[in-house]
Amino acid sequence: MNFKYIVAVSILIASAYARREENNIQSLSQRDVLEEESLREIRGIGASILSAGKSALKGFAKGLAEHFANGKRTAEDHEMMKRLEAAVRDLDSLEHPEEASEKETRGFNQEEKEKRIIGPVLGLVGSALGGLLKKIG
């Protein structure tokens, strides 16, 4: 009779352990789903902010291009315009997606392009504004 109780208690303990493990797994998968949803929301917000920034930057670059096109350019102005044109081309390439099968690669490449573009473009914008302020002042 003691053997039956030992077996019954062992089965109860094993089933309780199995239920607890199953609940832990479900809890982890629910957390993963919530984290993934949060990341998607953050990426969506970041993409919209980046898109607005790209549009503003492209408008600014085009305005600078028109300003420099109407006047005489020095070699420094010419070099700055070349860099701005390259930055605008890179920004345009970010907006045109490739094939759907290359989606993951495109995401990685887009992040790399954004990293490569943002630093130099901010420097160019700063130097362009500084140059304009010098000419105006």
From Swiss-Prot:
Localization (cell): Secreted
Principal location: secreted
Modified residues (Isoleucine amide): 136
Name recorded for this polypeptide: Bombinin-like peptides 2
Any one GO biological process: defense response to bacterium
Key words of the record: Amidation, Amphibian defense peptide, Antibiotic, Antimicrobial, Cleavage on pair of basic residues, Cytolysis, Hemolysis, Secreted, Signal
Asparagine amide: residues carrying this PTM: 70
Tissue: Expressed by the skin glands.
Protein family according to the UniProt entry: Belongs to the bombinin family.
Keyword S-adenosyl-L-methionine set for record: no
Signal sequence annotation: 1-18
Cited function: Bombinin-like peptide 2 has antimicrobial activity, but no hemolytic activity. Preliminary evidence indicates that this peptide does not lyse and thus kill the bacteria by its antimicrobial activity.
Region feature Disordered, mapped onto this chain: 92-112
InterPro entries from the UniProt entry: Bombinin
Domain of life from the UniProt record: Eukaryota
Recorded GO CC terms: extracellular region
Lineage of producing organism: Eukaryota, Metazoa, Chordata, Craniata, Vertebrata
